[in-house]
């Protein structure tokens, strides 16, 4: 029985590899089963077969992943580098488990585009080694897996695949918030940035650092999504004219999209009156007041008035300026008010105007050579002298002089009253200081080189008892002349007797034989009458001489 070889095996690309038997059997002969070849002889053909198929498959160069943008064009690259003869190249798209031919290039029959791709697919060139195509007007259905296939002879088919991802570029818009931004109002949406129907969803950021953002996203069945971002802030007039920027990022964009928005903050008028320099005097000309107003929306008009309701002649209001047509007089002194209003309210400002007297100026007469004559001398003698000052200035000087005199008199009187009060207080305090108790002072004897002073010495029985403080100091006195019976007596009832005050005097040498110590001047030294005594506030009577000791 003869054996026939089976079909040749196919390469993964469809090429067939021919295998032949090493010992073909002779016709009509029955031979024993051949001996299995060594393992190495079996591996060599298999290695050559897999090498040929792998070399053919790896020779088609494509991009594994391609990103396409909806509505735009995309190129699908396919380069074929083989040494075999290329008989045909084609592109196919995989739909589930089946494939759909997109385009075919045959060297003899030319180009062919199938189905919905007609008019949208073009080959880049006519070379069989470059199967790159351009797909126009990308739609959602164009996403998926595409195969670039090449048919060669004698090895058969070779192919590589690329995956196309369709992105949708978002539609970006920036609009003003629904509500007006009012100075001092609550948190308000200033601007809204929208990135609509993007695939995938876009990313929105804000620049400005004046508020905060709040975003929300909505998804759709076609895998697109819309993101809405609101920029909120607390409006203030100082933010007027500031710029905030919406920044949109998306993989389908070549660069970020940036939209800016200028904040429009509305506020009531801010009013100020200018033009008065504080030196408006009688007779001055060409002065005016200006009403400056800053408001958004712009103010309707400016209204001038005076606080006292008067409106002197010569005042002309033109737009925001008040003109003083005539030379200034004291009648123009007053408080001028400017009121400005817009749709958000009314504001005003006022300025106090004071018209002072004209400045005093002395004009020097030009020096002209003068020749005297008898008639001129007579005219000079009879001419009345004129003061170079106006009468109003003289009246002012007179008033100032009278005021100065009155102020001086009042000040002098107040000064005298103050001095009198101080003197009385001083005398009263001095009188209150002396209590009427007189204590003899310790007598300090002179040195050997000095003669003893002749002081009056009081008698011992004429002095009151010591106070406690003095007794402590003189507990054991030396040569103390105070009599013992005096110290033992608690009281001297005769001390306040006027008759006992008249004593005889002893000479100073009466005590010369005694040692010097604590001595008292006796009233024997004095011969005084009632006129020589002084009555004290506590009822005691003291000698005038003792008063001055």
Curated annotation (Swiss-Prot):
Protein's organism: Mus musculus (Mouse)
PANTHER family, per the entry: NECTIN-3, NECTIN-RELATED
Residues that span the membrane, as ranges: 405-425
Residues on Cytoplasmic side: 426-549
SMART domains: IG
Cellular component annotations (GO), alphabetically ordered: adherens junction; apical junction complex; axon; cell-cell contact zone; cell-cell junction; dendrite; hippocampal mossy fiber to CA3 synapse; plasma membrane
Tissue note: Ubiquitous with high expression in testes. Localized in spermatids at Sertoli-spermatid junctions. Expressed in ovarian granulosa cells, but only faintly expressed after ovulation.
An MF annotation (GO) of this entry: cell adhesion mediator activity
UniProt topology in membrane: Single-pass membrane protein; Single-pass type I membrane protein
Record-given protein name: Nectin-3
Organism taxonomic ancestry: Eukaryota, Metazoa, Chordata, Craniata, Vertebrata
Annotated knockout phenotype: Mice show an ocular phenotype, microphthalmia, accompanied by a separation of the contact between the pigment and non-pigment cell layers of the ciliary epithelia. Male mice exhibits infertility, suggesting a role in spermatogenesis. In the hippocampus, the formation and the number of adherens junctions at the synapses is impaired, and the trajectory of mossy fiber is abnormal. In the auditory epithelium, impaired formation of the checkerboard-like cellular pattern of hair cells and supporting cells, due to aberrant attachment between hair cells.
Signal peptide stretch: 1-57
């Amino acid at each position: 029985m003869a054996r026939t070889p089976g079909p040749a095996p196919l390469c993964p690309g469809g090429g067939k590899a021919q295998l032949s038997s090493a010992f073909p059997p002779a016709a009509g002969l029955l031979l024993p089963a051949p001996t299995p070849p060594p393992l190495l002889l079996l591996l060599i053909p298999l290695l050559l077969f897999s090498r040929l198929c792998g070399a053919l498959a790896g020779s088609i160069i494509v991009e594994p992943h391609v990103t396409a943008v909806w509505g735009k064009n995309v190129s699908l690259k396919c380069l074929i580098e083989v040494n075999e003869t290329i008989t045909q190249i084609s592109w196919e798209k995989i739909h589930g488990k089946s494939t759909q031919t997109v385009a075919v290039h045959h060297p003899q029959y030319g180009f062919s585009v199938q189905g919905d791709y007609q008019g949208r697919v073009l080959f880049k060139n006519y070379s069989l080694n470059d199967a790159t195509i351009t797909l126009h007007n990308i739609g959602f259905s164009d996403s998926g897996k595409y195969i670039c296939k090449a048919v060669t002879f004698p090895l058969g088919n070779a192919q590589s695949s690329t995956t196309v991802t369709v992105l949708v570029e978002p539609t970006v818009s920036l609009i003003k918030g629904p509500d007006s931004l009012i100075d001092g109002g609550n948190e308000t949406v200033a601007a809204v940035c929208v990135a609509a129907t993007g695939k995938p969803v876009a990313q929105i950021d804000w620049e400005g650092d004046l508020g905060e953002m709040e975003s929300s996203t909505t998804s759709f069945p076609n895998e697109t999504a819309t993101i809405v971002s609101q920029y909120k802030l607390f409006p203030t007039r100082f933010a007027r004219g500031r710029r905030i920027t919406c920044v949109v990022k998306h993989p389908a964009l070549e660069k970020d999209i940036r939209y800016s928005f200028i904040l429009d903050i509305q506020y009531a008028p801010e009013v100020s009156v200018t033009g008065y320099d504080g030196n408006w005097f009688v007779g001055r000309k060409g002065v005016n007041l200006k009403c400056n107003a800053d408001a958004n929306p712009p103010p309707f008009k400016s209204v001038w008035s005076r606080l006292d309701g008067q409106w002197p002649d010569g005042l002309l209001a033109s737009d925001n300026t008040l003109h003083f047509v005539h030379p200034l007089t004291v009648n123009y002194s007053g408080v001028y008010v400017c009121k400005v209003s817009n749709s958000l309210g009314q504001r005003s400002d006022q300025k106090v105007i004071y018209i002072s007297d004209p400045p005093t100026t002395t004009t020097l007469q030009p020096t002209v050579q003068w020749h005297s004559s008898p008639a001129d001398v007579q005219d000079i003698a009879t001419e009345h002298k004129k003061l170079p000052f106006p009468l109003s200035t003289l009246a002012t000087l007179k008033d100032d002089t009278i005021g100065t005199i009155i102020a001086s008199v009042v000040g002098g009187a107040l000064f005298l009253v103050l001095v009198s009060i101080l003197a009385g207080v001083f005398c009263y305090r001095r009188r209150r200081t002396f209590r009427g108790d007189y204590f003899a002072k310790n007598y300090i004897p002179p040195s050997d080189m000095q003669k003893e002073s002749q002081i009056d010495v009081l008698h011992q029985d004429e002095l009151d008892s010591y106070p406690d403080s003095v007794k402590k100091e003189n507990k054991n006195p030396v040569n103390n002349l105070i009599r013992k019976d005096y110290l033992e007596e608690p009281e001297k009832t005769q001390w306040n007797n006027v008759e006992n005050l008249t004593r005889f005097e002893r000479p100073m040498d009466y005590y010369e034989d005694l040692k010097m110590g604590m001595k008292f001047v006796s009233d024997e030294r004095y011969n005084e009458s009632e006129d020589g005594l002084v009555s004290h506030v506590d009822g005691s009577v003291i000698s005038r001489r003792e008063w001055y000791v």
